[in-house]
Amino acid sequence: QPQNHTSDLYIWLQQNGYKIEQEVLAEEGTQLYEILYVTHGHMDPFSEIEAEIGVTESRYKDKLFVKHLKKLINQRKMILNGIDIESANVVNTAKYQKALTDEAILEEILWRFM
């Protein structure tokens, strides 16, 4: 299982004829791991942020789901804190806007689970 950029794996699986049947989060120390049960099949398209959050109902029922959301929110905050928007170039401005949008989506989902 990849530990970074898991959304890339999700999107690759979807685009190459695989279906994510189940997602489980596992925790070891401070690290969260994503465990996937994958079969051949069709999945409806999903966005990059949906791929990071999880694309199956099992993810939303996982006891570590809130912790997973908080981790994703913290990653966005680190991006936002690392970019000086006043002096940012076009690429950094786009990264900033994406992180801001993603953070808002994640916060809204987290609010529903708190």
Predicted regions and their residues:
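Class I S-adenosyl-L-methionine
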Residues: 1-114
